[in-house]
Amino acid sequence: MLQQDFITIQLPKNELVIMPTSVLTRLHQYRQLKFWHKEKGGIFLGRYRGQYIEVTDVTLPQHDDICGRFFFNRCSSLHQQTAYQQWQNSNSEITYVGEWHTHPEQFSTPSTQDITEWQSKLSGSFESMLLCIVGQSTDWFGCFQDGVISKETSSSLTSCPQNYQL
């Protein structure tokens, strides 16, 4: 098995997100570094394994998505189709585990619009949902659980979390 680097993100309520750095690298390709760059986004796919949320893949921006300098609206059905295909191909193990999008700011934080949309979209979720805003320099990670949005408590780069079997 190939050695792979992961980022681990500690969420409130003792949950840990495990994400290959290759996924984060793909997101960073959409950073809004120039004034003409528009917000982009997609969804996280992965599995829930006890206290872990394992991110396995991500959907990337699609042509049908609506975006501007300060807004992103995921409209393309390809995000849903990709999630459904991975769910089918994994015997219902891989599923939608969260959302990501970019912001045109050095140190990203959720806007009032982000919070309102997440509360509206995710209010029926039974599991914790991973949230990410990709900034120009740093990324904001958080989760939506039980109607509450919380920021991650820490993140680090590791080869593989202790006591975790891939």
For each feature predicted by the language model, list its residue ranges.
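Histidine-centered divalent metal-coordination motifs
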Residues: 101-103
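Conserved beta-strand-loop surface patch within small alpha/beta domains used
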Residues: 1-96, 105-166
